[in-house]
A protein has these predicted regions:
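Residues located in well-ordered beta-strands
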Residues: 40-42, 169, 198
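Bacterial N-terminal signal peptides that target proteins for export
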Residues: 1-7
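Histidine-centered active-site/metal-ligand motif
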Residues: 60
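Cytochrome P450 catalytic-core helices
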Residues: 57
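Protease-domain processing segments flanking chymotrypsin-fold serine proteases, especially trypsin-like
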Residues: 12-52, 266-269
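Catalytic nucleophile loop of clan PA
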Residues: 185-214
Length: 269
């Protein structure tokens, strides 16, 4: 069967757009961990004149850490096109007090990173976080396809520390309007380590549109009791709980306020 040249060109263009939106998102997504807990995070930038970067993750992940610092797994692109893992320590507390901004109601935290990172990193513009108007315009809803980037059970895609890409669908209805229900269900198997991972779809001009953040999984717990044994069995339901991006936006704005918690200043060399 012969395929018309214009169809071939269209398919090539579509493939390029898909690669672009996913690559832009993965370049801004990083593992965040300490000896006690591992999660996923991503970097957002606000419009000028704000030059800081905003690290987004689930608050329960940061609350589970034990020290005043955590490790952000960065990646350095080498001249031959390969990547090298670069673990970078960031402050998350000062004298035991949190440095992150948190939402009043939701499990999301944002750290404002004012100091430059040791290697160039990808970031996602604040405008890519979908508010209610953007969701309405996109016409996504029940069974719409979505993508996630996470570190399930701390697993990395390769030695450079890239996250794992997966796909699912929106599994609950209605998605809108935003109101008392700040989250929705997604049909993909969630694991520990996924929390803080971006949930996204293709946006305008081949750019990613973030429609939420993974923060929980669902499972069925069963208690087994007999005369000589008592144990619990956890059955995964193959569902993740996703916080709407609107509430990530609100938390970033909290982190950007002058009175928000600030990390300690670096000592002069």
């Amino acid at each position: 069967m012969r395929i018309a040249p214009h169809i071939v060109a269209f398919l090539a263009l579509a493939a390029t757009a898909t690669a672009d939106f996913a690559t832009e998102m993965i370049d801004a997504t990083f593992k965040l961990f300490d000896p006690a807990v591992t999660g996923t995070s991503f970097l957002v930038r606000r419009e000028a004149p704000d030059t800081a970067l905003y690290l987004v993750t689930a608050e329960h992940m940061l609350k589970g850490t034990k020290a005043d610092t955590a490790t952000l797994v960065l990646r350095e692109r080498l001249d031959d096109g390969t990547y090298k893992r670069r673990d970078h320590t960031i402050p998350i507390r000062r004298d035991g007090k949190r440095l992150w901004a948190r939402h009043e109601k939701d499990d999301v935290a944002v750290l404002r990173l004012a100091d430059p990172l040791p290697v160039p990193v990808g970031t996602i513009p604040f405008a890519a976080l979908a508010d209610e108007a953007a969701l309405k315009a996109s016409r996504i809803g029940l069974t719409s396809q979505l993508f996630v980037l996470t570190y399930p059970k701390a697993f990395e895609a390769n030695e450079a520390g890239f996250p794992v890409a997966r796909q699912g669908i929106i599994a609950s209805h209605p998605l809108l309007p935003l109101g008392k229900k700040h989250s929705y269900l997604a049909d993909f198997t969630a694991f520990g380590g996924d929390s803080g991972g971006p949930v996204f779809v293709p946006g305008a001009e081949g750019r990613p549109m973030i429609i939420g953040m993974v923060f929980a999984q669902f499972r069925h717990d069963e208690q087994i009791k007999s005369e000589y044994e008592e144990r619990s069995i956890h059955y995964p339901l193959g569902l993740g709980d996703v916080l709407h991006a609107q509430y990530i936006r609100e938390t970033i704005e909290l982190a950007a306020k002058p009175d928000a918690p600030k990390p300690p200043e670096k000592a002069a060399p």
